[in-house]
A protein has these predicted regions:
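Extended alpha-helical coiled-coil rod segments
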Residues: 1-199
C-alpha cells in the first residue's frame, strides 16, 4: 500500500542518512589505529551489502504502485521519492568505496612509515659498524673483524628486497596523490642514499 511504501521509504531515507555520515567522515586522515578503522569500514561495507535487497524491494514496491496507479493521484510524488532514494543509495555506495580506497592508502602509508623507521634504525647500526676505526692488533682480531665485516655485507645484501619493497610502496603512495608526496620522496631518497653508501 501507499502508506506502507511511505513508512518504508522514510525508514530507508533515515537509514541512508545515518550511513552517509559514517561514509563521509574523514577518520582516515588520522593515521592512529588505521587498521582497526579499516576493519570497521569492512564491516560497514558488509552491512550496506546486506541491506541492498531491502532498498531494491522498496524501489520495486514504489514502481509497482506507480505502474498499477495505486498512488491516490500521487504518482509524481512517489516517482520523485524513488528518484531520491536511488540517488542517495548511489551516492552512499560511491562515498563508501571512496572511503575504502582512502583507508587502504592510509594503511599503506602507515606500512611505509613503519618500514622507513625500521630501515632507518637498521642503517644507523650498519653505519656505526662501518665507521669503526678498529683495524685489529693481531691475526686473530683481524680475522674476527673480516668475519664481522662479511656478516655486515651479507646483512646489507639481504636488505635489498626490503629497500625495493619500500621504493615500490613509496611509488604507489606518490601515484595515488593522497598524501604529502614531497615528504614520502624525501624519506625514500634519504634511505636510498644511505643504503647506497653502506653498499660501497
Amino acid at each position: 500500500t501507499l502508506q506502507q511504501f511511505s513508512r518504508d521509504a522514510d525508514e530507508i531515507e533515515n537509514w541512508i542518512g545515518e550511513k552517509l555520515q559514517m561514509a563521509t567522515d574523514e577518520s582516515y586522515k588520522d593515521p592512529s589505529n588505521i587498521q582497526s578503522k579499516h576493519q570497521k569500514h569492512q564491516a560497514f561495507e558488509a552491512e550496506l551489502a546486506a541491506n541492498a535487497d531491502r532498498i531494491e524491494s522498496i524501489i520495486a514496491m514504489g514502481k509497482n504502485l506507480v505502474d498499477k496507479h495505486q498512488c491516490a493521484g500521487s504518482e509524481d510524488a512517489v516517482q520523485q521519492r524513488l528518484g531520491t532514494i536511488t540517488e542517495q543509495w548511489k551516492y552512499l555506495a560511491a562515498k563508501t568505496s571512496e572511503k575504502s580506497l582512502k583507508l587502504k592508502e592510509a594503511n599503506k602509508q602507515r606500512t611505509f612509515n613503519a618500514a622507513v623507521k625500521d630501515i632507518d634504525f637498521w642503517l644507523g647500526e650498519v653505519e656505526s659498524l662501518l665507521k669503526s676505526e678498529d683495524s685489529g692488533k693481531d691475526l686473530t682480531s683481524v680475522q674476527n673483524l673480516i668475519k664481522k665485516h662479511q656478516l655486515v655485507e651479507a646483512d646489507i645484501a639481504a636488505h635489498e628486497d626490503r629497500i625495493k619493497d619500500l621504493n615500490a610502496l613509496a611509488e604507489s603512495l606518490v601515484e595515488s596523490g593522497q598524501f604529502d608526496s614531497d615528504t614520502i620522496e624525501d624519506k625514500r631518497n634519504s634511505i636510498n642514499e644511505r643504503y647506497a653508501v653502506s653498499y660501497t
